[in-house]
Amino acid sequence: MSQAQYAGTGRRKNAVARVRLVPGTGKITVNKKDVEEYIPHADLRLVINQPFAVTSTVGQYDVFVNVNGGGYGGQAGAIRHGIARALLQVDPDFRDSLKRAGLLTRDARMVERKKPGLKKARKASQFSKR
């Protein structure tokens, strides 16, 4: 008989993370690499661990993640979102604390598109009165 597995999908900017939680020791594997190796920034690793801290389940689950698209920040946010959704399958009572921490809400902020006639989305070339 196999162990229980809990799955969740998280998204942030252009990143999509497919997350599996398996009861274990708290090891996080991202795209078949250790999380310290895959995400070099310590503050982003803290972001990834937020759902466990909020639900007091630190070190209880091994996390296996496939993530693609976006940069480090977007991928970390997508992983956090996926872990939070997977923890809901573990225990539906976590919903209140995860919702209060804002971890279940998909962050809808996206990069604004570049407009024609402007240098970037909002940056215009310098205005000359004369």
From Swiss-Prot:
The keyword Ribosomal protein applies. SUPFAM superfamilies: Ribosomal protein S5 domain 2-like. The keyword Transmembrane helix does not apply. GO terms for biological process: translation. GO terms for cellular component: cytosolic small ribosomal subunit. It holds the Pfam family Ribosomal_S9. Keywords: Ribonucleoprotein, Ribosomal protein. One of its GO terms (molecular function) is structural constituent of ribosome. PROSITE patterns: RIBOSOMAL_S9 (PS00360). Belongs to the universal ribosomal protein uS9 family. HAMAP family: Ribosomal_uS9_B (MF_00532_B). This is Small ribosomal subunit protein uS9.
